[in-house]
């Protein structure tokens, strides 16, 4: 299986391309977090409720991303990164092009298409790492993806706000279209992986594995932990966080984006620490994901107090803890595929993502329409539930030999 991805140099180059692809998907994922003024302008121009357009535009990405998980993992495992990865990069280009027309309808449809296509990036990366590297490296390799993803998330905070002020949204979309075409071409021209269909495998076998995963309690407990950590963080980061910061805390859009930058920076720094701790120190996964959900619970508790007391100092502490919780959740994708055949790795992570991002989309939609104080209470309840479920159902997947 590993030979299909080429030697050390070629497999490393493939990971670089896939990381660039993932950077683009992550940027799309969180960019709406600082676009409130642009979205409000379009809503007012078209007589649409401001909060409703923000909620729908943001969650459109995640509902489509979730839908795509149903079959992109199976397609990647069956037909490989070369064909499926490059195809979905082209679909991403089409979505960005649709957004370029700047009407509410084209923005929502385009963002949904982008979200649909983005599902291929992380799943392709997880397939490539499973086929090319040992299980003991999966935590660190996943942390690399989250690090570069969060670097793009950092760019999508205060720097993006400055860029939008200077050049506008259309210029940004033009640059993103060019970058997407380059990634699509590189994936098709340089990748050798053709999936199990070219190696005597059958699509029905992959679907059978998917059904087995659905019945596994481990997958549901693990997904609950990720919803409690990364899901709640992402909902805050990409939608309702700016409402909290500009509302109860009365911060400007520019200052609010700086607070979101702190969250992304902490997430970035915590991810490789979690990967190293899991792979090399503990040589275990479950203690790390358990620590993540406990930290998330503490973070939302602090944020609830900070909002009631209008304390920016306590708010800052809660955001740092939230970043740590999200960073430590990076052991979850390896846990979703370890213990199963590596050739089905994309399918395994796809189901995990489907549960995670469907819940995230629902949390986003509800939280954006509520008063921020009650939104925090919802996140806290989710974090507590995630702690209980991961403790009961998730199993250790990386054990000492």
Language model region names:
Residues 2-8, 193-223:
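Juxtamembrane intracellular "pre-TM" segments in multi-pass secondary transporters
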Residues 13-45, 236-242, 363-367:
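Extracytoplasmic
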Residues 78-89, 279-294:
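Cytoplasmic membrane-interface "Motif A"-like loop-to-helix N-cap segments
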Residues 120-133, 327-341:
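Intracellular juxtamembrane helix-capping segments at the cytosolic ends
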């Amino acid at each position: 299986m590993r030979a299909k991805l080429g030697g050390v140099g070629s497999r490393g180059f493939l990971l670089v391309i896939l990381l660039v692809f993932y950077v683009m998907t992550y940027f799309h994922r969180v960019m709406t977090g600082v676009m409130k003024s642009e979205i409000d302008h379009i809503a007012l121009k078209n007589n649409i409720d401001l909060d409703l357009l923000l909620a729908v535009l943001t969650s459109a990405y995640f509902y489509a991303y979730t839908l795509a998980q149903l079959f992109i993992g199976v397609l990647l495992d069956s037909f490989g990164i070369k064909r499926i990865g490059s195809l979905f990069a082209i679909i991403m280009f089409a979505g960005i092009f649709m957004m370029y027309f700047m009407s509410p309808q084209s923005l929502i449809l385009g963002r949904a298409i982008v979200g649909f296509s983005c599902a291929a990036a992380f799943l392709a990366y997880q397939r490539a790492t499973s086929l090319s590297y040992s299980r003991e490296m999966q935590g660190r390799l996943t942390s690399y993806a989250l690090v570069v993803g969060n670097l793009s998330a950092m760019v999508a905070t205060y720097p993006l706000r400055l860029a939008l002020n200077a050049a506008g949204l259309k210029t940004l979309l033009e640059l993103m279209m060019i970058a997407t075409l380059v990634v699509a071409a590189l994936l098709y021209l340089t990748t050798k992986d053709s999936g199990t269909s070219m190696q005597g495998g059958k699509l029905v076998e992959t679907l059978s594995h998917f059904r087995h995963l659905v019945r596994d309690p481990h997958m549901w407990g693990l997904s609950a932990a990720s919803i409690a950590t990364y899901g709640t963080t992402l909902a805050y980061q990409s939608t309702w966080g700016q409402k909290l910061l500009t509302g109860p805390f009365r911060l400007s859009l520019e200052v609010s984006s700086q607070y979101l930058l702190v969250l992304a920076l902490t997430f970035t720094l915590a991810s490789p620490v979690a990967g190293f701790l899991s792979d090399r120190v503990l040589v275990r996964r479950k203690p790390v994901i358990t620590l993540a959900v406990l930290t998330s619970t503490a973070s939302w508790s602090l944020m609830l107090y900070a909002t009631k007391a209008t304390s920016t100092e306590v708010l800052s502490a809660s955001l740092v803890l939230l970043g740590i919780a999200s960073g430590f959740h990076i052991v979850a994708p390896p846990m979703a595929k370890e213990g199963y055949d590596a050739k089905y790795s994309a399918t395994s992570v796809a189901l995990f993502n489907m549960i995670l991002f469907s819940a995230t989309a629902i949390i986003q939609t509800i939280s954006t329409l509520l008063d921020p104080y009650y939104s925090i209470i919802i996140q806290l309840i989710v974090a507590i539930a995630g702690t209980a479920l991961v403790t009961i159902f998730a199993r250790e997947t990386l054990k000492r030999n």
